From Swiss-Prot:
Pathway: Lipid metabolism; polyunsaturated fatty acid biosynthesis. The gene is Elovl2. The keyword Lipid metabolism applies. It is found in: Endoplasmic reticulum membrane. Keywords: Endoplasmic reticulum, Fatty acid biosynthesis, Fatty acid metabolism, Lipid biosynthesis, Lipid metabolism, Membrane, Transferase, Transmembrane, Transmembrane helix. A motif (Di-lysine motif) lies at residues 276-279. It comes from the Eukaryota. This is Very long chain fatty acid elongase 2. It is a multi-pass membrane protein. It comes from Rattus norvegicus.
Amino acid sequence: MFGPRDSRVRGWFLLDSYLPTFTLTIVYLLSIWLGNKYMKNRPALSLRGILTLYNLGITLLSAYMLVELVLSSWEGGYNLQCQNLDSAGEGDIRVAKVLWWYYFSKLVEFLDTIFFVLRKKTSQITFLHVYHHASMFNIWWCVLNWIPCGQSFFGPTLNSFIHILMYSYYGLSVFPSMHRYLWWKKYLTQAQLVQFVLTITHTLSAVVKPCGFPFGCLIFQSSYMMTLVILFLNFYIQTYRKKPMKKEMPEGAAGKEVKNGFPKAHSIAANGVTDKKVQ
């Protein structure tokens, strides 16, 4: 379906064998299960300082990837409708190097869930959250090995921009004084849905007008992105359509648990990650 691996990424960290990626994913899943058991009868941790640094780090990494992907694809003369794997020379290598950081960032983002476990936010560890985190890390191992440049650049470019907004929101939410300015969290989920639709459209444009990019990869990516559209749309409907916030009600009314001035039912699921406000 995918053909031989791309020799240009041979020897890159974590890419030569699938075993490390698979093993780290299993460790991630076991950490959720065992961590919840360990924390069951223990007090939740605050992690305020760690979360501040973590969110800042992911925001800066996302900003680097966004800028570098835009510059490298522009200088490589990338075609927005369809870009093959080997026509931009050094530009393709530059894109591949950024996409390796994108793959590695998906490993780092496993910490999103670990922080939920340590803070006993078990209601936030949903199927959407775990599915998205675990699958992205594994899928991007495949992308880097078979299609590390060309058409693959578009989704990470959009996602890096979304992550700048998302982790900036998380970083600001650590500070109670900033909560009054965080009215825009609902729009992060909307932005993600737009991102998925744009990525699917961009992917299928290479099916309509082929340029030599592997057909099987295009179909697989479109199918995977559709699962995210379905899951995120379901989350959006359940959270913002069926359970609207009633501004006239006092805090704690209608049985809603209020954390830091925000009803728990009004959290977001940006990139599969729901609200990470510090108690």
